[in-house]
């Protein structure tokens, strides 16, 4: 599966002066070098800056905690993967045979990485101002959907605050297993409470995502017992 040049009217919203940047941004490491991991690294920083700036301007009364939680929600893997699908990146990725066979073009982690790489490619192609103008509209619906200044706290934070409010021991997160190739990891984690006694297991493409899922399930257990 290989990339095609973005045509006028394509959802990405940018015509590359240097098509090689686009090609590299869409080339997964499974397809060999050069691949998009360095662009992904740069794009991660740019996306965080763009979203931080947008939230800072839109939420003048929000405190640091609310801004941080909102940014985390907008740049998480699942949210970026949704953008990747909206931009039709999956069908344009250059993948190795193994990833093609396993449906890598549909995997959240690969799509999220590709979005970050595309952001970096746009930045290198035309500079920060143009990059902001192209990329922020991708996030507009998600930005508008956030309750102003009151971003939903992630499950781990909510669980911790619930326990602290009752002066109970904080949860323990234990790694049960880690599997998969380096670019397609799967983590299996348990969230364990001493008091009240509770345990749940979560899985995800990163340890953080697995812990969040496990915390969500523990919260559901606590809610059902109250």
Curated annotation (Swiss-Prot):
Domain DRBM: 154-224
Annotated localization: Cytoplasm
CDD domains (UniProt xref): DSRM_RNAse_III_family, RIBOc
Listed GO CC annotations: cytoplasm
Domain RNase III: 5-127
Reaction equation(s) it catalyzes: Endonucleolytic cleavage to 5'-phosphomonoester
SUPFAM superfamilies linked: dsRNA-binding domain-like, RNase III domain-like
Keywords in alphabetical order: Cytoplasm, Endonuclease, Hydrolase, Magnesium, Metal-binding, mRNA processing, Nuclease, RNA-binding, rRNA processing, rRNA-binding, tRNA processing
Coiled coil: none
Any GO molecular function: rRNA binding
Similarity field: Belongs to the ribonuclease III family.
Identification of the protein by name: Ribonuclease 3
Organism: Xanthomonas euvesicatoria pv. vesicatoria (strain 85-10)
